């Protein structure tokens, strides 16, 4: 299932997969911009604000009511991170053409709705609607204040800031509360105009309409005429030899331990499949070393897992522990990592990781949204690969390659959120 790549207008690009495999179709439009302290929060707020109302549908209720009339179609604006880049866009999902009379089906109408969202927002007095903005600013404040209510996420975020200090990856996309008041309707309107008139987007479509017809339709209905493509570059490097350490206290029963590792292996590296296998074996599943050995056999923690970011080159380990178990848990995690360096992987761990990676690749082929993320991410990095090819790459990974990938990882930061309450005093959802 390989996408056809076409030009839309003079500068935009379309990745299109023509298939009748799915009952629904998907159309995505995405901009990639560098993550910067000055603009990250404003972009995040802008893409929440755009869904509040458009020229034809001045309220959010009217906009989504019309989507409901289109066989319960949906459009979701988003703002997320990919390495040092900030991805801004919207995804439309709608019933396939063969279920609504054939031809292009709902695709023309969904292009019009995306055009309303991105090109024709509600602009009374030629500016984004100030009352909508104030409402979204209040919501953003609440979101920022609520970070502390997710101790596990807070610990990981603080570890990320330590490990990538001074780099775009350390920035929070939602920003800090102190900078919200300075955001104005006039300023956000200018940011929206700059985005939609200077930058060229990438489109992704999966459905039954021929790619050439989709490209022509997009050129007519979504004339995003920007001629600039931001360089999608991400700084990739190993950390210094010194491991950074920091601790905070919070009224919790548990302690939250976060350990960050950096690597020079990213999605385009030959060892990327091996690094994915490494993460699966290390702490990526219930059959991993961290779960079975640190949590189950030694009962050192309430939870212990790892996550991998191949856009940036990072692995984060997160664990919820009794405060008094901090030192022994840290050492236990390092012991499991050292086992990977030596290539000590049991048959059970190896087989479980192979099956898990194979399942993920097969599952991709059944999910239009997952296929969109897969192809858009690789296109952004100049990688030509299909899920079938990635599946074959996982099948070919050897234990020696996993050990080699482990040698490219280096611990760089440890953050500990120290709980100050006795058992029974805290929130059971910690």
Regions from the PLM with identified roles:
Residues 140, 144-148, 159, 163:
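Glycine-rich, mobile lid/loop segments that gate access to catalytic sites or pores
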Residues 142-146, 242-256, 359-368:
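Short, low-order "capping/linker" segments at domain edges
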Residues 80-82, 189-196, 305-309, 403-407:
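Short, flexible, solvent-exposed loop/turn segments with mixed acidic/basic and small polar residues
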Residues 53-56, 97-101, 120-129:
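Short, polar/flexible loop-turn hinges at active-site or ligand-entry regions and domain interfaces
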Residues 15, 23-43, 60-116, 152-175, ...:
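M16 family metallopeptidases and their MPP-like homologs
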Residues 11, 71-76, 180-192, 297-304, ...:
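Short amphipathic beta-strand starts and helix->beta connectors
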Residues 64, 120-144, 231-239, 335, ...:
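Acidic/histidine-enriched alpha-helical segments
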């Amino acid at each position: 299932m390989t996408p056809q790549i076409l030009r839309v207008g003079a500068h935009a690009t379309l990745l299109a997969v023509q298939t009748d495999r799915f009952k629904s179709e998907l159309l995505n439009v995405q901009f990639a911009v560098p993550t910067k302290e000055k603009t990250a929060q404003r972009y995040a707020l802008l893409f929440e604000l755009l869904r509040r109302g458009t020229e034809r549908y001045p309220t959010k209720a009217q906009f989504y009511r019309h989507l409901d009339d289109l066989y319960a179609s949906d459009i979701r604006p988003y703002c997320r991170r990919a390495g040092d880049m900030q991805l801004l866009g919207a995804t439309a999902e709608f019933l396939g053409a063969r279920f609504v009379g054939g031809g292009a089906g709902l695709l023309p109408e969904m292009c019009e709705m995306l055009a309303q969202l991105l090109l024709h927002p509600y602009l009374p007095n030629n500016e984004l609607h100030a009352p909508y903005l104030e409402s979204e600013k209040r919501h953003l404040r609440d979101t920022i204040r609520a970070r502390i209510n997710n101790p596990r996420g807070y610990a990981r975020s603080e570890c990320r800031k330590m490990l990538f200090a001074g780099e775009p990856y350390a920035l929070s996309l939602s920003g800090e509360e102190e900078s919200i008041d300075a955001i104005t309707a006039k300023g956000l309107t200018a940011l929206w105009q700059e985005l939609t008139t200077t930058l060229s987007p990438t489109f992704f479509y999966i459905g039954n309409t021929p790619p050439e017809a989709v490209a022509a339709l997009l050129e007519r209905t979504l004339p995003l005429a920007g001629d600039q493509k931001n360089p999608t570059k991400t700084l990739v490097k190993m950390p210094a030899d010194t491991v950074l350490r920091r601790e905070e206290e919070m009224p919790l029963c548990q302690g939250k331990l976060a350990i960050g590792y950096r690597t020079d292996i990213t999605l385009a590296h030959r060892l990327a499949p091996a690094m994915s296998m490494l993460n699966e074996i290390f702490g990526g599943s219930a059959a991993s070393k961290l779960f079975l050995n640190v949590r189950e056999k030694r009962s050192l923690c309430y939870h212990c897992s790892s996550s991998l970011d191949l856009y940036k080159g990072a692995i984060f380990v997160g664990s919820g522990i009794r405060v008094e178990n901090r030192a022994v848990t840290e050492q236990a995690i390092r012991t499991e990592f050292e086992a990977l360096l030596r290539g000590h992987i049991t048959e059970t761990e190896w087989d479980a990781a192979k099956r898990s990676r194979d399942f993920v690749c097969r599952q991709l082929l059944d999910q239009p949204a997952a296929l969109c993320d897969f192809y858009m991410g690789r296109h952004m990095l100049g990688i030509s690969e299909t899920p079938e090819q990635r599946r074959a790459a996982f099948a070919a990974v050897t234990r020696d390659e996993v050990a080699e990938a482990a040698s490219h990882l280096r611990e760089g930061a440890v953050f500990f959120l120290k709980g100050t309450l006795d058992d029974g005093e805290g929130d059971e959802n910690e």
